[in-house]
Amino acid sequence: LGLCLAAPRKSVRWCTISPAEAAKCAKFQRNMKKVRGPSVSCIRKTSSFECIQAIAANKADAVTLDGGLVYEAGLHPYKLRPVAAEVYQTRGKPQTRYYAVAVVKKGSGFQLNQLQGVKSCHTGLGRSAGWNIPIGTLRPYLNWTGPPEPLQKAVANFFSASCVPCADGKQYPNLCRLCAGTEADKCACSSQEPYFGYSGAFKCLENGAGDVAFVKDSTVFENLPDEADRDKYELLCPDNTRKPVDAFKECHLARVPSHAVVARSVDGREDLIWRLLHRAQEEFGRNKSSAFQLFKSTPENKDLLFKDSALGFVRIPSQIDSGLYLGANYLTATQNLRETAAEVAARRERVVWCAVGPEEERKCKQWSDVSNRKVACASASTTEECIALVLKGEADALNLDGGFIYVAGKCGLVPVLAENQKSQNSNAPDCVHRPPEGYLAVAVVRKSDADLTWNSLSGKKSCHTGVGRTAAWNIPMGLLFNQTGSCKFDKFFSQSCAPGADPQSSLCALCVGNNENENKCMPNSEERYYGYTGAFRCLAEKAGDVAFVKDVTVLQNTDGKNSEPWAKDLKQEDFELLCLDGTRKPVAEAESCHLARAPNHAVVSQSDRAQHLKKVLFLQQDQFGGNGPDCPGKFCLFKSETKNLLFNDNTECLAELQGKTTYEQYLGSEYVTSITNLRRCSSSPLLEACAFLRA
């Protein structure tokens, strides 16, 4: 008996919110038994919110929620996460999301930040694409102090006239002024109002009643099958530009995700839930069985357990939590409708920097203090976790190596400013307007290891700044991959320190962790052999035979330039560079002996935050940059005792990108191609997550 009680429950406890759902769930349970699939049991509650609480308390396992509730469920103390998304059919392509867009007629001449006083068309009050997203996005421009003042009143005063079906037309006649229904049907919450829903809101624009329609990406295509007709319309983008209607992936107010099944983020039984859903859709999905249909409800009750319009489910990669699933624009728009005007304005003005590891966090806090809180800090223990915080809108920016600019770019972030180093050219333009020259990736060895060349590295011990970074991973490993065709880098070198690799593997064997020998192989400065200085230290302390760093690393840490005990007696002449032709040269001759030229590190952010971020960073570097009045007195942005915290210590300034504003343009096609090839060797959980989110 004891054994039976200890056996894990093999049944998924599905949470229901009404008698009709409970009845469908019971049918679901019986039919899964018949096909001997994973078993499901039914838990009765009276609302989605009660279900969220029950799942968090381990009294139920799963429930399907819409985007707004996925947001609630992800918050503390529930911390649920989406594990499977419903898939819908849109224009022949199965989708797990749609995009909320603002459609206008070509030539109407205004941008998203100039909508005050125009006429607006909405799908309906309280709907995602037609109300919550656009009004949340326009919140900073509304004259609304926030709850408890009615939002409808502020919107009625913002647009010159609108059609917002379901609005309170008696109290706010302006919100129903453009609607076309007659008498009681004017502004009705159904298709009795001709301008209701997606197609209705578009018709309101098409007929010339309104100037802008807030709809979804497929609306224009469904209503105008002819491309020539579609060409008369454009989308308004968050960066206050316009784009063609088919560019909705680059130009939308928010991505609205489909309904998702949520579970606990710890011990959530998600494998079992997925087995149940996968089998259920195979047996009882669209056009499968007449006995029971998973995506069919009763005529009186729609969308029981799942949406009736769903085609099936896809599994959500485990890296994705509710914030990543919903995305920054959606989260910001939602937050904007819950906060006071002062809170919204403060959040927009502030720049939240993401610090990687405790040492960067300390420097960031100092920066925040001296900036009068114009800069605030978020922190994470790895660079990829920081990129995820920017994707969720919990941070605005961080400075990245080229390898991570690639990851961030694949996730939809853009480069904003690049680090620039002192130029050799004395009559070059000022730092901010000088094109960043990039830096040289080099392989450094001890002069005393005279027999070691680029061609005899196999079986040696290697030191790397971190996995996925440019100079120490993507460039040398890309070259080795091209030579050997093998991804087994742990077999090529006998031992390595490559922070960010599997701590149990030989790629972490040489790593040492912090002074307490903890956090070994962590990709942040807790690992003493992390970053350019750390990888060189790994060579200098004779742990490794070769260090992959950049051209200035040896120069910055020898001949007394670094006063730390391990570096103070090192001499530049005791180290040499390996050239790709099998020869060696002094470290000062990197120009003619390097592995590749690498793009400079650059600051990335969401595209709609880029202009504001630039403005703030230029002011900050004017004050705390190398030539600023407050460096070294109060704080130096580009100094950190040779640790390269937040920025590289040899940065002269953050510079304009010379028009290279996408990750592909900034990194250059050669580097992008080499990383794409190298990525076949390793999977990054964040890249997998972003591939799912941007599919």
Curated annotation (Swiss-Prot):
Mod. after translation: Poly-N-acetyllactosaminic carbohydrate moiety seems to be needed for TLR4 activation.
Keywords of the record: Disulfide bond, Glycoprotein, Hydrolase, Immunity, Ion transport, Iron, Iron transport, Metal-binding, Osteogenesis, Protease, Repeat, Secreted, Serine protease, Signal, Transport
Assembly, per entry: Monomer. Found in a complex with LTF, CLU, EPPIN and SEMG1. Found in a complex with MPO and LTF; interacts directly with CP, allows Fe(3+) incorporation into LTF and activation of CP ferroxidase activity.
Source organism of the structure: Equus caballus (Horse)
Molecular function as annotated in GO: metal ion binding; serine-type peptidase activity
Stated role: Transferrins are iron binding transport proteins which can bind two Fe(3+) ions in association with the binding of an anion, usually bicarbonate. Lactoferricin binds to the bacterial surface and is crucial for the bactericidal functions. Has some antiviral activity against papillomavirus infection. N-terminal region shows strong antifungal activity against C.albicans. Contains two BBXB heparin-binding consensus sequences that appear to form the predominate functional GAG-binding site.
Sites where the protein binds hydrogencarbonate 2: 465, 469, 471-472
CDD domains: PBP2_transferrin_C, PBP2_transferrin_N
The enzyme's E.C. designation: 3.4.21.-
Domain Transferrin-like intervals: 12-339, 351-680
Gene3D superfamilies tied to this protein: Periplasmic binding protein-like II (3.40.190.10)
Chief site of localization: secreted
UniProt entry tagged with the keyword Iron: yes
Sites carrying sugar chains: 143, 287, 482
Binding site for D-glucose: 436, 600, 666
Domain of life: Eukaryota
Gene Ontology CC: one annotated term: specific granule
Top-rank EC class of the record's enzyme: hydrolase
Binding positions (Fe(3+) 1): 66, 98, 198, 259
Active site: 79, 265
Subcellular location: Secreted; Cytoplasmic granule
First and last residue of the signal peptide: 1-6
Name of the featured protein: Lactotransferrin
Gene behind the chain: LTF
